[in-house]
């Protein structure tokens, strides 16, 4: 996957750092500098500097004694700040717990880039467990929430 092309007024280093964060967020296993550089067709020295900066800020963590990296605690904190400050989240969360107390699993999701991004799941005590971890993204056609969003969209 080539690095994202930056547009007018965008900062290439910031764009590349975001690309690295997205890659590591989507990957279950930690990745090394050379592998990341290869995926973006970038010099390893450039990727190394970006990773070092992201790691120093807590957005990436080195996996044990390896030379591989994964998402760090600071990325979690930034994402959590979004949810905590969301008026939608604050308004809907009590209703999700009401649903769960009535044996219905409740989901909060938003439409982003023609996908559903889940912000919260409150699991009921029912026999069937359907979960979407916060931050996960699904295609609109593959979930009931996505289909409900599609039904309300204009052609």
Write out the residue ranges for each language-model feature.
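Amphipathic alpha-helical effector-binding/dimerization core
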Residues: 65-155
């Amino acid at each position: 996957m080539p690095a994202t092309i930056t547009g007018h007024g965008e900062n290439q280093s910031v764009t590349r750092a975001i690309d690295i964060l997205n890659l590591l967020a989507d990957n279950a296993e930690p990745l090394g500098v050379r592998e990341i550089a290869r995926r973006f067709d970038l010099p390893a020295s450039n990727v190394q500097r970006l990773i070092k900066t992201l790691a120093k800020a807590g957005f990436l963590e080195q996996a044990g004694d390896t030379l591989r990296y994964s998402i760090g605690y600071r990325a979690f904190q930034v994402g959590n700040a979004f949810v905590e400050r969301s008026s939608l989240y604050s308004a809907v969360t009590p209703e999700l717990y009401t649903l769960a107390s009535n044996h219905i699993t409740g989901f909060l999701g938003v439409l982003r880039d023609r996908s559903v991004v889940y912000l919260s799941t409150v699991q009921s005590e029912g026999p069937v467990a359907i979960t979407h971890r916060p931050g996960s993204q699904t295609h609109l056609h593959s979930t009931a929430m996505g289909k409900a969003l599609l039904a309300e969209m204009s052609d």
